[in-house]
Amino acid sequence: MSSSDLTGNFYKEFFIQNSTENATDAIKISLNQVDSYNRFNKGREIYIYLKGLFLVEVKSGDGVYTIGGNTKDGEVETLTSNRYPSHIFRSASTEMIIPKSVSILESKDIGIFVTFDKLEFPISSVGQPFVDPADDYDSHKTVQRCSGFSYYNFILETSSFASFKNEVLIDGGGSISGIVSKTYNGSELVLVLNTTEDVELNSSRCTLSDSNEFSVIFEDDFESYPNNLSITGVWNNFIEAGSKEWKIKTTTDSQNQGSKIAQIGAYNSGDSSNVAWLISPPINLDSQSIEFINFQSSNSFSDNSNLELLISTDWNATNSGIISATWSALPGIIVSDSESYQNWIDSSYIDLSAYSGTAFIAFKYTGGGTNNSGTFEIDNFQVITQN
């Protein structure tokens, strides 16, 4: 159990995750039962008898997969109070759930108990209650995290029925832990508290970096490349599976109209799988004290295709060594499927100070088949360092 309705911030639902620490998957259970914490408390190991149940999204297309008792119009319905005792069983074991450390909200973490550091509420919100008295159901409060030269903002969602709704947002910086979820209409990721004990803002507020103290050591806006051709030159353009590779295109998107961009997509490929890499030139992380990367991304024909931002410090710069190298995920913001195809999303400034040696940054696209053929686009890739 990663969530609890002890404080009333969850209603007739709970989330379970696949591990007490470093969880990678979670799922929602929808049941017609309030105060379920009396039997299914946070950290409780439970078993679910799946026969006769349904696994669908809460709202069609929202990505919040839920076990329920029935479906209607492609969406889940709750497991009734008469049925759930025959399907959900608790064990005698209750474990401590160690929150997964993250720096951005991502769909892959929905239902997982996560923690953010370097968080604070905007000064304008300090002293306000968690729930605005004018809100009937849920209140949204902005939380901000220092991310290089700007703030990464996301929403903390609180139910108007939560027992702590009248507690006020405090000043200071620190950590906040909660469950990654989505708004009622499924349009936006949010963080939801189990309890305000998981709000630990006991330190000073964070400080943004000064852009005047940094300079660019590598950048590429892709304007110098020939249009409609494969990307070559300093980038490594590698096809792991399928036939599609990264190419230069000129975008017509209103937010970036006329710019040349790096584009990948599996549409009309005819391949069951497409995996394509675009890997940066080497970055010497030992020549400077602090490095950040930044870029913008957009998409088209949003579906279940995927774009990952990765880093390696042991790749040998050969195509044959790409798969065997160690690649770690970086916490950059990549455009979501729900975003309009006209929009370009900033990655925020991604800190590379945890790495040393010679690093390579990779964009790895995975798609293919009839349901995973979406297009991703990258522009204005930049590596900066402190002077």
Predicted features and spans:
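Beta-strand acidic-aromatic groove motif in beta-rich domains, primarily in extracellular
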Residues: 9-14, 58-62, 290-294, 303-312
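Terminal, low-complexity interaction segments
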Residues: 333-387
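Extracellular beta-rich ligand/substrate-recognition surface
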Residues: 263-276, 336-343
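Extracellular beta-strand-rich recognition modules
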Residues: 50, 222, 280, 287-300, ...
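Short beta-strands within extracellular/lumenal beta-sheet-rich domains
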Residues: 271-288, 292, 345-349, 378
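Extended, low-complexity, turn-rich repeat/linker tracts enriched in Gly/Pro/Ser/Thr and Asp/Glu
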Residues: 6-8, 123-127, 131, 271, ...
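Extracellular glycan-recognition surfaces and repeat-rich motifs
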Residues: 221-266
